[in-house]
């Protein structure tokens, strides 16, 4: 029992059957005791608390260490436990979502439990064995230590497994179906310990959560919800009225007026604080609404931003394609411009030559025959010129068609280059830092100014390297096939072992059936023998009655004979009972051994299944 003058008490966070909650606030550094949920006797009339929930009540009681347990004492070990666990709600079975079968999760839970036990001052030493699987006695000590952190007044009885079940019901442990009395007796079993470890981890988490909740400090205004201030005012009022009563003063109403004024002032302050809190609450609600609207607007803007980013990527890709096409068209236009300039220069030369010839012709004396000859030559030249013009138009058309074919070839080449780069990236030779690139740059790029229009020598450099990569990939594929075959053989071996274990399990079950039938036969035989003994005893009693009626002289002899027969019957019945108990013990021992063996087989099958699943996952990842 702690001293009542301590400044801060630890709340007992265990649930209580009482719904009464008392609250006190410290005033001027005075010591305060923690609240009690147990029924208490009031010394004076209780006033209603100013708690906003309207569920608290303040009771003037002597200073003492309260508890969350009811004020009842334990009368016997098995009758009742003096704590809050007298009434508990019904707990429906819930499937445990925690991965208790995972060894890593078990290690984490065990580490947290052991660390908390060391921090909380657990008296017994904790070794490596306690981290994973303590004994039954050690588990009982650990659970008592943890539960006393929640309810210091609870006392455990001789049979701790019943107390553990009752305490877990009181704590509303959601997975109570996994914690039975038979499991609590066999703590060291591998199939039992994960559920027990999960329960201990849950209790430790509950204790840590409640300790954090108790450690929270709530600041309260000095003149608002201060019960000690009210106590002081009431005490001053009682002292003044008592002195006035002793002095027989006529001013008996003056303390009442001051008391009323004090409470009115306190109520006014509380009203002002309430109004201020209401206005603050409304402002916060408005801020929350504006923040929610802002969040919705932000979400819309984020969606638009993501859409614009996607459009930007598409636009950049389109712009890059257009840029490459513009560059190719620009180069083609430059070539055509050069050709046009050459043709214009040739045309200028021809014009100059024509002018010179015309000048020569005009300065010459030409006869009619020569003129006719010149006219015919001119006509011939015109015809030749027209033929040359038609040929030039045909050549221009052919050049245009050739340009279209060249552009189509360039587009096809660009697509093939992109396809090559994507395939090279998939097989791991692009970029330079890829796995199979060997620090070589095999990324194709179109170079219109180069001799081969691309930046790499496909025949002498790229193709031999790709053939080498293909050979290496083929070798890796064959190696993976060999590994897959080995894994398949291992899986077949595991399946055969599982089949053998299943056959062995069926044999054990058949032997168990035969043992049970033999047990039933022994039970029937024992009952028949007992009936025979009972019939013989009845027969002897009837003979005794007949002997009593026939002869009074042989009474002593018959009495001695009856006593000897009764002693013999008791000995036979006792021997039969011992034989029956021995048979029951042997059958129970055989059943226990069979059950342990079956559980061991199940655990082995689960381990084999996990190994098989792990191998299968590794194989799948390797194939991917």
Swiss-Prot record:
Q: Which family does it belong to?
A: Belongs to the NDC80/HEC1 family.
Q: What is this protein called?
A: Kinetochore protein ndc80
Species of the source:
Schizosaccharomyces pombe (strain 972 / ATCC 24843) (Fission yeast)
Annotated coiled-coil segments of the chain: 263-399, 484-560
Domain of life, source organism: Eukaryota
Looking up PANTHER family in the UniProt record yields: KINETOCHORE PROTEIN NDC80, KINETOCHORE PROTEIN NDC80 HOMOLOG
What GO biological process terms are annotated to this protein in UniProt?
A: attachment of mitotic spindle microtubules to kinetochore; attachment of spindle microtubules to kinetochore; cell division; chromosome segregation; meiotic centromere clustering; mitotic sister chromatid biorientation; spindle attachment to meiosis I kinetochore
Q: What is the lineage of its organism?
A: Eukaryota, Fungi, Dikarya, Ascomycota, Taphrinomycotina
The cellular component terms of Gene Ontology attached to this UniProt record, alphabetical and capped at eight, are: chromosome, centromeric region; condensed chromosome, centromeric region; kinetochore; Ndc80 complex; nucleus; outer kinetochore
InterPro entries tied to this protein: Kinetochore_Ndc80, Ndc80_CH, Ndc80_sf
């Amino acid at each position: 029992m702690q001293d009542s003058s301590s400044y801060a008490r630890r709340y007992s966070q265990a649930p209580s059957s009482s719904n009464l909650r008392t609250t006190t606030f410290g005033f001027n550094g005075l010591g305060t005791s923690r609240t009690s949920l147990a029924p208490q006797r009031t010394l004076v009339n209780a006033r209603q608390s100013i708690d906003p929930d309207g569920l608290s009540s303040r009771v003037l009681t002597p200073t003492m260490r309260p508890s969350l347990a009811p004020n009842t004492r334990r009368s016997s070990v098995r009758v009742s436990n003096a704590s809050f666990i007298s009434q508990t709600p019904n707990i429906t079975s819930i499937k445990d979502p925690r991965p208790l079968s995972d060894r890593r999760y078990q290690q984490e839970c065990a580490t947290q439990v052991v660390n908390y036990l060391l921090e909380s001052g657990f008296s017994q030493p904790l070794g490596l064995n306690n981290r994973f699987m303590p004994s039954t006695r050690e588990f009982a000590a650990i659970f008592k230590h943890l539960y006393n952190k929640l309810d210091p007044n609870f006392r455990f009885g001789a049979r701790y497994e019943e107390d553990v079940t009752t305490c877990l019901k009181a704590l509303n442990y959601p997975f109570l179906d996994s914690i039975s009395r038979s499991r609590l007796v066999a703590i060291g079993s591998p199939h039992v310990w994960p559920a027990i470890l999960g329960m201990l981890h849950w209790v430790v988490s509950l204790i840590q959560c409640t300790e954090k909740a108790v450690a929270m400090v709530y600041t309260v205004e000095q003149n608002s919800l201060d019960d000690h201030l009210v106590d002081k005012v009431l005490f001053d009022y009682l002292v003044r009225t008592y002195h006035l009563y002793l002095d027989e003063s006529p001013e008996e109403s003056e303390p009442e007026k001051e008391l009323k004024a004090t409470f009115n002032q306190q109520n006014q302050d509380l009203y002002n604080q309430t109004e201020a809190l209401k206005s603050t609450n409304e402002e916060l609600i408005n801020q929350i609404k504006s923040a929610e609207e802002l969040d919705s607007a932000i979400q819309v803007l984020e969606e638009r931003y993501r859409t614009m980013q996607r459009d930007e990527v598409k636009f950049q890709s389109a712009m890059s394609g257009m840029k490459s096409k513009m560059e190719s068209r620009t180069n083609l236009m430059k070539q055509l411009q050069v050709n046009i300039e050459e043709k214009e220069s040739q045309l200028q030369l021809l014009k100059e030559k024509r002018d010179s010839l015309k000048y020569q012709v005009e300065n010459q004396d030409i006869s009619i025959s020569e003129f006719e000859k010149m006219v015919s030559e001119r006509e011939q030249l015109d015809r030749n010129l027209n033929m040359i013009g038609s040929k030039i138009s045909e050549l221009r058309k052919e050049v245009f068609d050739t340009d279209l074919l060249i552009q189509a070839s360039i587009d096809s080449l660009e697509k093939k280059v992109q396809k090559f780069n994507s395939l090279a990236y998939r097989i791991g030779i692009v970029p330079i830092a890829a796995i199979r690139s060997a620090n070589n740059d095999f990324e194709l790029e179109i170079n219109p100014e180069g001799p081969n229009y691309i930046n790499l020598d496909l025949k002498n450099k790229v193709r031999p390297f790709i053939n080498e990569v293909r050979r290496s990939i083929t070798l890796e594929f064959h190696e993976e096939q060999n590994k897959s075959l080995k894994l398949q053989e291992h899986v077949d071996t595991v399946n055969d072992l599982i089949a053998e274990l299943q056959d062995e399990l069926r044999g054990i079950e058949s032997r168990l059936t035969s043992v049970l039938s033999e047990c039933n036969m022994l039970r029937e035989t024992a009952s028949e023998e007992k009936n025979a003994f009972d019939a013989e005893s009845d027969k002897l009693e009837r003979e005794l009655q007949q002997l009593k009626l026939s002869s009074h002289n042989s009474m002593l002899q018959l009495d001695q004979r009856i006593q000897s027969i009764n002693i013999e019957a008791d000995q036979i019945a006792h021997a039969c009972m011992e034989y029956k108990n021995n048979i029951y013990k042997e059958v129970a021992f055989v059943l226990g051994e069979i059950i342990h063996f079956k559980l061991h087989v199940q655990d082995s099958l689960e381990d084999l299944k996990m190994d098989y699943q792990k191998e299968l996952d590794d194989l799948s990842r390797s194939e991917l």
